[in-house]
Amino acid sequence: VPRVQKERKMPDFVHLHIHSEFSLLDGANRIKDLPVRAKELGMKAMAITDHGVMYGVIDFYKACKKEGIKPIIGCEVYVASRTRFDKEPQDKKYYHLILLAKNNKGYQNLSKLVSLGFTEGYYYKPRIDLEILEKYHEGIICLSGCLAGSVSQAILNGNIEEAENVAKWHKNVFGEDYYLEIQNNGVKEQVMVNQKIIQIARRLDIPIVATNDAH
């Protein structure tokens, strides 16, 4: 009698990379509509990850609770290419990184990071740097970000070694709370980046998470 192989169930999809109207000049999603749509799609949770700010998290929390959706509080932070104190023309370049609070301590640390982005790192955008990311990482889940993330940017520049070094640094800081992010957004470059990220994830034993950078 042939053995029947048990089908492996995929985890339920949850949006972990979403922008609202508080991602100014960028996000078109209305906070009040997000959990309603998530409920229609049978999702049990969703995150908010506006660019560099947390203005909408209270409204988002209340809207999710109203619809029975678990709210995940996060932010897509801007990471300075050097330090948060460097503010010269070359420092207009920055990277994107997704941070999600997994508990109250994580929410406190995320709030601290976002605040420091404004009070210490502001240069065109509210920027943090690796120093304070390491200092205030407790209770935070970190995703590698979109095509503007430091891992993806290194891949796009043809520097796989640099991409791996970036991933290693974040893994050392966040441990099992660091994930490499892949997306299916119709962008040609994303397909190549996804392939390289999967390879890096296997080599470095880092888990992968699928997101879709919803705006």
Feature-to-residue mapping (PLM):
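Short polybasic linear motifs
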Residues: 1
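Phosphodiester-processing cores and adjacent nucleic acid-binding clamps
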Residues: 4-215
